[in-house]
Amino acid sequence: MPCQKNQKLSPTVPSREMSPLPDFWLPVFWKNQFRTTIELPTREKYPQVEGGTAIMTGSNTGLGFEASKQLLSLGLSHLIMGVRSIEKGNAAAEKLRKIAPSARIDVWQLDMQSYDSIQAFAKRCDTELSRIDFVILNAGLSPSSFELVPDTGHEVGIQVNHISTALLTILLIPILKTKTSGHRPPRLTTVNSLTAHLCKFPNKDERPLLASFDDPKITPWSSQERYGVSKLLNQLFVVKLCEIVSPDDVIINMVDPGLTKGTNLGGHHELGGVAGALAGAFFAICGRPVDRGAASYTNAVYGHGKESHGCFLMSCEIAPLAGWFYTHGDVLVDQVWNETLEELDFAGAKDIVSNI
C-alpha cells in the first residue's frame, strides 16, 4: 500500500535481490527528504489497526510517541509502551489517553541496556497478553561519546541498537506465533536507517567482530559512524533470521523513517556550541516532520504483506539493503549471526532459533 501522494505500486522485488544503492548517496537523500511526502495514515487505508494489540518500544518520546498517537487514532485497542523510565512513560501515557480515552494503554519497564529487563519484558508479553497483532522495535540511541554498558561490557550503541534488539526479537518471535489473532500473521518491525549503507566499517575484518567495538584503540570512536554500523549489524542479523522464520508465522521487516526533526536521536542537543547549532540547523532544514516519519511505521506494519519479509523499507517502498550486504554479505551475515547468538546464549537464543 503506497503512503506517498500519487505513488504507484511497482513490481515487488525483495531487498536482497535489488541492486545496491549508489555509493554517492546524496541523490537518494535528496529524494527521500525533499521529493517525497509521506501521507498520514487514515482508518480507510489501515483498517487492520482497529481493535488490535500492539507493542511499541521507546514510545514515550519522538517517533515512538508520535507513532503511538497515530495508531491510537486509527482505533488501536491496546498499546503496550516499553520504556526505560516508568515515570516518563506514565506521563506520555496520560497524553495518549486524552487522544484515545477508550483504549487500554499499559506502561511496562524495558531497559535495553539490561538483559534481565529485556527477558522480564518478554516474559510479561507471554504471560499477560492473550493477543499481539504487531510489534514495533523503535527503541534506539545515537550516543555522542564513547560509553560501555557496565553489565555487558559492550559499547552502548552496539548494545542497544543491535545486540539487545536482537535478543528482544528472538524472544518475541515464538510468543508472537502463539498470540496471533488468527486471520493474519503477526508483524514485527525493527527501526533501521539509511546510515547502515553509509558507514565505513573499518573493523569489518576484526575477529571477534562485536568485541572490537568495545575498544576505541581497535575501532576509533565516531558517533555518526557507530550509529550507522549498529544499524548495519542488526540489518544483517534480521536478513539471516528471516531465512529461518516463515512469513506465514511472523512477518519481519525493517523501516527507515528518514531524517526526522523533533527527536533527540541525532544527539545534536548534547553537542552545544557551534557544532550543536549547525547540527540543529541541518535537522531543521532537512528533517521530515515527526508525524511524517512516524507514518512510515504504520506503513511498514500494514502497508506491506509477506513480500516485505526480510526487507528494508524506505519512503514506504521496499528498498535495497545496505551496500555491505552485496559486497561482503557472504562473510558478514554469518559472522554477525554467529557472534550475536553466542553472546545471547545465556538466554537460550540458539535453542529458540533452532525450534522456531
Where in this protein do the model-derived segments appear?
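Short, contiguous pre-domain boundary segments
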Residues: 37, 319-324
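Short glycine/threonine-rich loop-to-helix capping motif typified by GTGT followed
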Residues: 264-267, 323-327
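C-terminal helix/juxtamembrane-tail motif
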Residues: 338-356
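Rossmann-fold NAD(P)H-dependent dehydrogenase/reductase core
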Residues: 20-266, 350-355
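Non-transmembrane alpha-helical segments in soluble domains
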Residues: 173, 238-242, 298-301, 337, ...
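C-terminal helical subdomain
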Residues: 279-320, 330-332, 346
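Alpha-helical membrane-targeting segments
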Residues: 2-37, 220-222, 259-291
